[in-house]
Amino acid sequence: MVVKRAEVLGYCSGVRRAVDTVLKLAKENTENKSGLYTFGPLIHNPSTMLRLKQMGVRTIDTENFTEDEDYKDSVIVIRAHGIPPSKKSELEKSGAKVIDATCSRVKASQALAKKHSEEAFVILAGDKNHGELISIAGYAEGKCLIVQNAEEAALIDLPSSLSANGSAVLIAQTTIKESEYEAIASALKKRISDLKVFNTICPATSDRQAALKKLAYEVDALLVIGGKNSANTKRLFQTAVDTKKPAWLIEDASEIPKEIFSYSVIGLTAGASTPDFIIDEVEKKLLEG
């Protein structure tokens, strides 16, 4: 068997920075003198989350958190997805030291939403339940709606201000597929005369998808490695399926399907929240047969 890796795969810079930040803090906190928390799951990867838990890192339930809780002398890390400004204020009031590991690209989208909500309506494209979009929406201060696909963009009720020739801006979830975003923008342009579209898709997403498409020409089957709850991994897997090559989505080496061993050349790619050691383990197990 031959195993070929996509030219671009695994951790993106934003996720790597967030993980490295927490790992460094955990190593400095070996005597557990103060609590170390992440506000919500740091990344959508079960293996990494288990490793962090074993190092004493705890996860705060974002939905049930209140500023009344006492986190004095603790450290709370904001994950790469970011959080709304109101939540950040609550964290600071809890007495904890707050470390912001929000991805720089998400911060840029937050700034766009804040700036343009003063004069226009903000429309976000992507998963309405995703932490990133929830964080960005918080900066639009109520002048915002989220559309998840082109069909929704064509039918969703728009505020009266837009019906009266008002202006709007469109901001994408950083992990959305370019084709999905273009379709949403096209549908909205037919309904909003003054719509400014910002390209806020992270190159890490499109780079992984492009590398996967290129890899598909060189292999017999594809394995996509990543958390099944990860938005970018699910989109990467859909790209693999679209190549028409046999494709599987796995979280780690234990999930490698038996069927894969009937193929001679296997292509490997991984989502932006998949650590290097998991990719290495999958490749090793494939080569061992």
From Swiss-Prot:
- The signal peptide here is none
Reaction catalysed by this chain?
Answer: isopentenyl diphosphate + 2 oxidized [2Fe-2S]-[ferredoxin] + H2O = (2E)-4-hydroxy-3-methylbut-2-enyl diphosphate + 2 reduced [2Fe-2S]-[ferredoxin] + 2 H(+); dimethylallyl diphosphate + 2 oxidized [2Fe-2S]-[ferredoxin] + H2O = (2E)-4-hydroxy-3-methylbut-2-enyl diphosphate + 2 reduced [2Fe-2S]-[ferredoxin] + 2 H(+)
Give the GO terms filed under biological process for this record: dimethylallyl diphosphate biosynthetic process; isopentenyl diphosphate biosynthetic process, methylerythritol 4-phosphate pathway; terpenoid biosynthetic process
Coiled coil (residue ranges) = none
Source organism, top-level taxon: Bacteria
Give the top-level enzyme category. oxidoreductase
UniProt remark on cofactor binding:
Binds 1 [4Fe-4S] cluster per subunit.
Binding-site residues, dimethylallyl diphosphate:
H44, H81, H130, S230, N232, S273
Which InterPro entries does the entry mention?
A: LytB/IspH
What Gene3D superfamilies does this protein map onto? 3.40.50.11270, 4-hydroxy-3-methylbut-2-enyl diphosphate reductase, catalytic domain (3.40.1010.20)
Molecular function terms from GO: 4 iron, 4 sulfur cluster binding; 4-hydroxy-3-methylbut-2-enyl diphosphate reductase activity; metal ion binding
Q: Which protein family is named in the record?
A: Belongs to the IspH family.
PANTHER family to which the protein is assigned, alphabetical: 4-HYDROXY-3-METHYLBUT-2-ENYL DIPHOSPHATE REDUCTASE (PTHR30426:SF0)
Q: Sorted alphabetically, which HAMAP family does this protein's record hold? A: IspH (MF_00191)
Protein name as it appears in the record: 4-hydroxy-3-methylbut-2-enyl diphosphate reductase
